[in-house]
Amino acid sequence: KEYLSKALQSLSQAAIVHTTLGPSGGYRLARAPDAVTFLDIVEAVEGKASTFVCNNIRANNPCRPGDYCETKPCAIARIMWEADEAWRAKLRSVRLSDLIVTLAAEIPANIWQSSFEWVLKRA
């Protein structure tokens, strides 16, 4: 619950959801589903920092030439940064509206209905 609460607070601060306080309060989307990407959500909750942080451990190699590690990032760092950007590009290309279409096709109507009723009982 604590993680979910913090995530929803972050989504509210990023203007992805609106918060309503009080006994009948809750959260709702602040934007249309086609205006929210998965990257918007991830960056709101986790931040915009790269998923890979290079510690330049090769600089600890006692056999390296003096400025060898300062000329360019190592191959591992470059690959990881490229992978991070590919991940972000994919998340940027998928919107909440895409998820709605996918779930509507994959989840039977009776499960949607029972889930909806379950939520209503607890609202």
Feature-to-residue mapping (PLM):
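C-terminal regulatory/oligomerization modules of transcriptional regulators
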Residues: 37, 50, 54-123
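Beta-hairpin "wing" of winged helix-turn-helix
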Residues: 15-30
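Canonical helix-turn-helix DNA-binding module
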Residues: 1-18
